[in-house]
Amino acid sequence: MSRTGKTSEFAVEQVLPDVRRGRMVILVDDEDRENEGDLFVAAERATPEAINFMAVHGRGLISLALTEERTRALGLSLITDDTGNQTKFGTAFATPIDAREGVGSGMSAHDRARTIAVAIADGTGPADLIRPGRLQTLRALDGGVLARRGHTEAAVDLARLAGLKAAGVICEIMKEDGAMARMPDLKRYARRHDIRILRIADLVAYRRNERQVRRRAETTLPTSKAGEFRLLVYEDNLETQAFVAMVKGEVKPLSIRWRSNETSNPTRFSRNVCSSVTLCVSHQPNSYLVGPPIIW
């Protein structure tokens, strides 16, 4: 059953089984953005038949969306010059590629499926690819759709959520007259080809339930006024920004005191730690109790 009754739109949980089986999904972004639908298939499931369907029935640019880490491992640079990325929505076009072996001209559905398989294979490096090639690559932002609500990030996120490699193949859907298909067109298209629609906005809402902070380091910090603290360093998965928590004694539910991040200057940081500890520590017989905790 669809999320919105008898329409072709579905929730994330409903499309993940399709993604795992290699079925296509139509990814639709916000109306105030591109307002377009892209055919999507997980890169691990990108067969020659899937690529041919995209070419015949999608009609747009067939692209391989990869994580930042993967594009670095493959030596793929962004296609920009000193003027920077001038695309309207910041699409990160990277070097187009062909597989070095097992392809002809690189353009056929078989060749592009082969190039995709090589690009996402474990152990593949820059030497296994020819550049420039016929398959366009895209670099997704770390953080996925929580960092950028684009088809590129949605493709990577959806493949990862399905338990597959974080890479997806996308192709814009165009109408027969060459115009871009909008939601009314996409709903008819989805019913005709029996493909489910997923709004990127729903993927954003789904991902907001994930844990976005992880602990990266722990050490001790001696202070002249309050003794020794445990110093815990956490990192925000979206902005890779560090936060520091100072802990002394048993941690109980408390309110949180926030300070601006000043960890880039160790001298300034140390001075602020000492002054702030004085403000938040109350003296008890033979002990200090922290409350509330400080986070930088």
Q: For each predicted feature, which ranges?
A:
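Catalytic domains of riboflavin
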Residues: 1-295
